[in-house]
């Protein structure tokens, strides 16, 4: 069944909170990656202070120094991974609370005065188990950090073989739209945005199920953000209504809530919402 439904005031309030939380985590990630890129560049630029190395007069010594720099960068990037994970993990926990409490708030506005606590086992399930896009969050971020390490080391080696100055190498690694750090930052934002969205929609479903179990007559509805970049499948899903335990269906695919297809082409950067 598909109907046209106007998002109510309380649902809009919850969506605004979600948007503000997402913007906050993006700012935090940008700050972390920006500082790390500066730290790496500073380590590399230390070589430019050594006039005996600038013209590659001592190739053997320079190679040894290069390896030492790589080890120091490894330490900086491991710290980056820990900070990024901590920020995103906190954000995902907030997403679950927003989705669950926001659903209760909306149901009360619709004349269903229910109140029950969040089930912590459901939180663990949503944050640590049910990521269907690929591996767990920490493993994915660790792989991204390892890729960043390899990219930076490759740039270091390439700079040496090309006869570039250390300042030039540092600039290429730390800045620019195609720098390793810029690519890694964008990847971290996609992970945070996609996982945060999935967690919030799943917590909404958890709350809907709890309400249903306590006797509330609740149905769920898919609400798509309709504009020029909306996926055709999500446009088709817009307005579909299902029983709480029934999946939404489109193009041979099924999902219990937005962000739950398990297909990156459907889930990454999804902006759809689950309403009741």
Give a label for each model feature.
Residues 1-182:
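N-terminal leader/targeting and assembly helices and adjacent pre-domain segments
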Residues 183-276:
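Acidic, glycine-rich two-metal-ion catalytic cores of nucleic acid-processing enzymes
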């Amino acid at each position: 069944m598909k109907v046209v439904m106007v998002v109510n005031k309380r649902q809009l309030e919850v969506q605004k909170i979600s948007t503000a939380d997402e913007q906050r985590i993006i700012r935090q990630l940008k700050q972390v990656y920006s500082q790390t890129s500066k730290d790496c560049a500073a380590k590399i630029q230390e070589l430019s202070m050594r006039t005996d190395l600038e013209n590659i007069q001592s190739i053997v010594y320079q190679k040894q120094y290069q390896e030492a720099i790589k080890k120091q960068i490894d330490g900086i990037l491991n710290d980056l991974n820990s900070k990024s994970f901590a920020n995103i993990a906190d954000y995902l926990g907030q997403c679950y609370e927003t989705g669950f409490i926001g659903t209760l708030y909306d149901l009360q506005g619709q004349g269903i005065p229910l109140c029950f606590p969040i089930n912590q086992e459901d939180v663990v399930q949503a944050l640590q188990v049910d990521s269907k896009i690929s591996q767990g969050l920490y493993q994915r971020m660790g792989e991204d950090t390892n890729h960043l390490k390899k990219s930076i080391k490759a740039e270091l080696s390439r700079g040496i073989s090309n006869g570039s100055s250390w300042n030039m190498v540092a600039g290429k690694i730390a800045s620019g739209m195609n720098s390793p750090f810029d690519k890694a930052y964008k990847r971290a934002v996609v992970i945070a945005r996609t996982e945060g969205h999935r967690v919030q929609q799943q917590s909404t479903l958890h709350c809907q199920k709890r309400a249903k179990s306590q006797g509330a007559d609740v149905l769920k509805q898919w609400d798509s953000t309709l504009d020029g970049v909306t996926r055709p499948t999500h446009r088709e899903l817009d307005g579909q209504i299902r029983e709480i335990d029934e999946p939404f269906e489109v193009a041979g695919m099924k999902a219990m809530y937005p962000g739950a297809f398990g297909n990156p082409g459907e889930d990454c950067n999804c902006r759809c919402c689950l309403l009741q």
